[in-house]
Swiss-Prot record:
PROSITE patterns hit by this protein: COX3
Alphabetized InterPro entries for the sequence: Cyt_c/ubiquinol_Oxase_su3, Cyt_c_oxidase-like_su3, Cyt_c_oxidase_su3-like_sf, Cyt_c_oxidase_su3_a-hlx
Similarity comment: family membership: Belongs to the cytochrome c oxidase subunit 3 family.
Superkingdom to which the source organism belongs: Bacteria
Organism: Corynebacterium glutamicum (strain ATCC 13032 / DSM 20300 / JCM 1318 / BCRC 11384 / CCUG 27702 / LMG 3730 / NBRC 12168 / NCIMB 10025 / NRRL B-2784 / 534)
Swiss-Prot/TrEMBL catalytic activity: 4 Fe(II)-[cytochrome c] + O2 + 8 H(+)(in) = 4 Fe(III)-[cytochrome c] + 2 H2O + 4 H(+)(out)
Name recorded for this polypeptide: Cytochrome c oxidase subunit 3
Membrane topology of the entry: Multi-pass membrane protein
Cellular compartments annotated: Cell membrane
Taxonomic path: Bacteria, Bacillati, Actinomycetota, Actinomycetes, Mycobacteriales
Pfam families the UniProt entry points to: COX3
Length: 205
């Protein structure tokens, strides 16, 4: 009797500990996004230091005249819209709606790809105006910050593709739903970073 009570008494704390134990996927995602946040914080710092130096020698303002703000706003709206469609996909995954998940993630992939292509077109236009990564301090700051962000967008698009391929090849499982949510966290993060870059580069200048 005592043994049974003792075992029950030991089992209860173990169950509580199991319930309170952090999900390793969540912890890993938080750690990864924290590292990414520090990386982009460094890029923002680099941009503002370059901006201060450029303003000091008078070479910064004339470079920003090449920016097409309405065009940048358009591709920004496209990227932000992809965050909305991504979240719709997550809602579908939580309901076990595989068709909805596929549909919304596919739309997200298309919108993300349009953003990358749009940014590539902007690069071509700016290079045509003589603005390159080697042409000036501003050119270096612009292409480095936006270029690294574009690489993160491409990585996000590829992650969506991987999720869809895994869903297509096997039965939909809770693990796949979790993977979809983790990818969405990364995508929302990339979108928020771009909003910060857009405000900094195209409005504050």
């Amino acid at each position: 009797m005592t043994s049974a009570v003792g075992n029950t008494g030991m089992a209860a704390p173990q169950r509580v500990a199991a319930l309170n134990r952090p999900n390793m996927v969540s912890v890993g995602t938080i750690v990864f996004l924290s590292q990414e946040l520090m990386f982009f914080a460094g890029l923002f710092a680099m941009y503002f230091v370059s901006r201060a130096n450029g303003l000091a020698n008078g070479s910064w303002g004339e470079q920003t005249d090449h920016l097409n703000v309405p065009y940048a706003l358009l591709i920004t709206v496209i990227l932000v819209s992809s965050s909305v469609t991504c979240q719709f996909g997550v809602f579908a995954a939580e309901r076990g709606d595989v068709y909805g998940l596929r549909k919304w993630f596919l739309v997200t992939i298309i919108l993300g790809s349009i953003f990358v292509i749009g940014q590539g077109y902007e690069y071509i236009t700016l290079v045509g105006h003589g603005l390159t990564i080697q042409s000036s301090v501003y050119g270096s700051a612009f292409f480095i910050t936006t270029g690294f962000h574009a690489l993160h967008v491409i990585a996000g698009v590829m992650a969506f593709v991987v999720v869809l391929m895994r869903i297509h090849k096997s039965k939909f499982t809770p693990a796949q739903a979790t993977a979809a949510m983790v990818v969405s966290y990364y995508w929302h993060f990339v979108d928020v970073v771009w909003i910060g870059l857009f405000i900094t580069i195209y409005f504050i200048q």
